C-alpha cells in the first residue's frame, strides 16, 4: 500500500501508510451516510404518490387533483411537512445523548446504537397502519440520524491519515448522495406498484440500516477514542494497525497529550463557549446554517413534488429526481478527488458562483413560465429547469455538502471535539427541520422568488468563506490551533498563548499537542 509521512507542527513526522483496514473501516462507517441519504430522498417521492396520500393525507390528494388550487400551493400541508421534518427534530434531540455516548462509550458503539434505531424505525414505517405509526417510525429514524451523524464524521476524521483525511471523510457525504439516488430509483420503481408501493419504499431503508449495524460490529474504534477513555495500550495497538507501521510514538504521544488535557475538562459544552474555542464554534455553527440556506435540502426532499408543481407528470418528476440524484453522486466524487489537492476554500468559493447563477436562472424561468393556474413549461423550458437544478446540485455536492461535515469534524480540539460535533449536528438538524417544515409553505407564498431568496443567502455565505474561513487541508487534526487559528488574520485575536490548555511545554519546547 502507499506509504508516507504527515508532518506535525513541531516538525515531527507521523509515519502512516494507507492501509486496507483504514479504507475498509471508513467505507463501513460511512454507510451511516447511506441511511441518512435514503431517509432524505425517500420522503419526497413517497409524498408524491397518490396511494400514500390516499392512506394518510386525503385532503392533500384532493387539493392535488383540483384545478382551483394554485400550482405552488398544492402540497402546502403542515401534517405532510411534519412527516418529512419529524425525523430531523428527533435527530436534534438525540444528538445530546449521542455526544455522551461518543465520549464515554466510543465512536463505534455509538454507530451501533444508531443502527438499532434505524432498524426499529424502518419496521414501524413499513408496517404503518395510521399516521401515528408513521410519525413514530420517522422519529426513531431521526434518533438514528442523530447518533450516526455525531459518530461517523468523528470516526472518519480520527482514523484517516492526515494527507487523505478530507477524501476519506467525504465518504460520509458520498454515501448520503448514494442513499438519495437509491431512494429516487426505488421511488421510480415503486410508484408503479399499487396500492402498496410506498410501503416497499419505506421498508427498503432496512438495507442501509443493516449495513451500518453490521459495519459497527466489525470496525475498530479510533485510537483517539480509546486513549480518551484510558485504554492506552489498546489505542497504541490500533494505531499501529491502522497506520501500518510500528513507528507510531510521535502520533501516539500527541494524542495522549491531547487526551490528558481533555480529561481536565469537566464541562465540554461550557468549554466550547470559552474565548479560545469561539472561532471553531462560530465556523461550525455558521457552516451548518449556510448549508441549509443554500436550498439544497428543499430541492432534494421535495424534488418529485417540486417537478410535479412545475407541470411534470408523476413519472417524469420522479425520473427528473433520479437524474439530479445521479448528478449529486458523481459531483461528490469530484470532491473526494480534489478536497486534499485544491483545498476547502477554493471548492466553496467556486461553488458559490455556480449556485448563485443557477438559482437566479431557475427563478427567472419559473417567473416567466409558471403561474398560479398555468404550469405548461414546454419541453425546452422543462429541460432547462432540470439542467439548472443539476448545475446547482453538482456545485453543492462538491462543496457545501461534504465540507459542511468535514470542516467542523477536523477543527475542534479533542477536549471539545465530541461536544463540538454535537452542536454541529444539532444546528444542522435544527435548520434542516426548519427548511423541511417551511419549504412547501414558502413555495406557496414566495412562488418562484424562493430561488431568489436562496441565491441571496449564497452570496452571504460566499463572502463569509472569502474573509473568515481558514484553509485546513493537510493540517494534522491535533494541531489546528497552532497552525490554523493562531495564524488567521481575524481569529488569532481569540487565541491566548498564556492559556495553559493551548500548548503544553515539553522540555521547554512545544510538542505540538494543541487543544
From Swiss-Prot:
Keyword Zinc-finger found: no
UniProt membrane topology term: Multi-pass membrane protein
Keywords of this entry: Membrane, Sugar transport, Symport, Transmembrane, Transmembrane helix, Transport
InterPro entries in the cross-refs: MFS_dom, MFS_STP/MST-like_plant, MFS_sugar_transport-like, MFS_trans_sf, STP/PLT_plant, Sugar/inositol_transpt, Sugar_transporter_CS
Localization terms from the record: Membrane
Tissue expression from the record: Expressed in roots, shoots, leaf blades, leaf sheaths, anthers, ovaries and embryos.
Membrane-spanning parts: 18-38, 79-99, 109-129, 139-159, 166-186, 200-220, 281-301, 316-336, 348-368, 380-400, 423-443, 449-469
PROSITE patterns: MFS, SUGAR_TRANSPORT_1
Induction: Induced by glucose, sucrose and salt stress.
Signal peptide residue numbers: none
GO cellular component terms listed in the entry, alphabetical order: membrane
Topological domain spans for side Extracellular: 39-78, 130-138, 187-199, 302-315, 369-379, 444-448
Coiled-coil positions: none
Topological region Cytoplasmic: 1-17, 100-108, 160-165, 221-280, 337-347, 401-422, 470-515
GO molecular function terms attached to this record: monosaccharide transmembrane transporter activity; symporter activity
Superkingdom assignment: Eukaryota
SUPFAM superfamilies linked to this entry: MFS general substrate transporter
Flavoprotein as UniProt keyword: no
Role this protein plays: Mediates active uptake of hexoses by sugar:proton symport. Can transport glucose, fructose, mannose and galactose. Can transport xylose and ribose.
Family to which this protein belongs: Belongs to the major facilitator superfamily. Sugar transporter (TC 2.A.1.1) family.
Protein name: Sugar transport protein MST4
Amino acid at each position: 500500500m502507499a506509504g508516507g509521512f504527515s508532518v506535525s507542527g513541531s516538525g515531527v513526522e507521523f509515519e502512516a501508510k494507507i492501509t486496507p483496514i483504514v479504507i475498509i473501516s471508513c467505507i463501513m462507517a460511512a454507510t451511516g451516510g447511506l441511511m441518512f441519504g435514503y431517509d432524505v430522498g425517500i420522503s419526497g417521492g413517497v409524498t408524491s404518490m397518490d396511494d400514500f396520500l390516499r392512506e394518510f393525507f386525503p385532503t392533500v390528494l384532493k387539493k392535488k387533483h383540483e384545478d382551483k388550487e394554485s400550482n405552488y400551493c398544492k402540497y402546502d400541508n403542515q401534517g405532510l411537512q411534519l412527516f418529512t421534518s419529524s425525523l430531523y427534530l428527533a435527530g436534534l434531540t438525540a444528538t445530546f445523548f449521542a455526544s455522551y455516548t461518543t465520549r464515554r462509550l466510543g465512536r463505534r458503539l455509538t454507530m451501533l446504537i444508531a443502527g438499532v434505531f434505524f432498524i426499529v424505525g424502518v419496521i414501524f414505517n413499513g408496517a404503518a397502519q395510521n399516521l401515528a405509526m408513521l410519525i413514530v417510525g420517522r422519529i426513531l429514524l431521526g434518533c438514528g440520524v442523530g447518533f450516526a451523524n455525531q459518530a461517523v464524521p468523528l470516526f472518519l476524521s480520527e482514523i484517516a491519515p492526515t494527507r487523505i483525511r478530507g477524501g476519506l471523510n467525504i465518504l460520509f457525504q458520498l454515501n448520503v448522495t448514494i442513499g438519495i439516488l437509491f431512494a429516487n430509483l426505488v421511488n421510480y420503481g415503486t410508484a408503479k406498484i399499487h396500492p402498496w408501493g410506498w410501503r416497499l419504499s419505506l421498508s427498503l431503508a432496512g438495507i442501509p440500516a443493516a449495513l451500518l449495524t453490521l459495519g459497527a460490529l466489525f470496525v475498530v474504534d479510533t485510537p483517539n477514542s480509546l486513549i480518551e477513555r484510558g485504554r492506552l495500550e489498546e489505542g497504541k495497538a490500533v494505531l499501529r494497525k491502522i497506520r501500518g507501521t510500528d513507528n507510531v510514538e510521535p502520533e501516539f504521544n500527541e494524542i495522549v497529550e491531547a487526551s490528558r488535557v481533555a480529561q481536565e475538562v469537566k464541562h465540554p459544552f461550557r468549554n466550547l463557549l470559552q474565548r479560545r474555542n469561539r472561532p471553531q464554534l462560530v465556523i461550525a455553527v455558521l457552516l451548518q446554517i449556510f448549508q441549509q440556506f443554500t436550498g439544497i435540502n428543499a430541492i432534494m426532499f421535495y424534488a418529485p413534488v417540486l417537478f410535479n408543481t412545475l407541470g411534470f407528470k408523476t413519472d417524469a418528476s420522479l425520473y427528473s429526481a433520479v437524474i439530479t440524484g445521479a448528478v449529486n453522486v458523481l459531483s461528490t466524487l469530484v470532491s473526494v478527488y480534489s478536497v486534499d489537492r485544491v483545498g476547502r476554500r477554493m471548492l466553496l468559493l467556486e461553488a458559490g458562483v455556480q449556485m448563485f447563477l443557477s438559482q437566479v436562472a431557475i427563478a427567472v424561468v419559473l417567473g416567466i413560465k409558471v403561474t398560479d393556474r398555468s404550469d405548461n413549461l414546454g419541453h425546452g423550458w422543462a429541460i432547462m429547469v432540470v439542467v439548472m437544478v443539476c448545475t446547482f446540485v453538482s456545485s453543492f455536492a462538491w462543496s457545501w455538502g461534504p465540507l459542511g461535515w468535514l470542516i467542523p469534524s477536523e477543527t475542534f480540539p479533542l477536549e471539545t471535539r465530541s461536544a463540538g460535533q454535537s452542536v454541529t449536528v444539532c444546528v444542522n438538524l435544527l435548520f434542516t427541520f426548519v427548511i423541511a417544515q417551511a419549504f412547501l409553505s414558502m413555495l406557496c407564498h414566495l412562488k418562484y422568488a424562493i430561488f431568489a431568496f436562496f441565491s441571496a443567502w449564497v452570496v452571504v455565505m460566499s463572502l463569509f468563506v472569502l474573509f473568515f474561513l481558514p484553509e485546513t487541508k493537510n493540517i494534522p487534526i491535533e494541531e489546528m490551533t497552532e497552525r490554523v487559528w493562531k495564524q488567521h488574520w481575524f481569529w488569532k485575536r481569540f487565541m491566548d498563548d498564556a492559556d495553559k490548555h493551548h500548548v503544553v511545554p515539553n522540555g521547554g519546547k512545544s510538542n505540538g499537542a494543541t487543544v
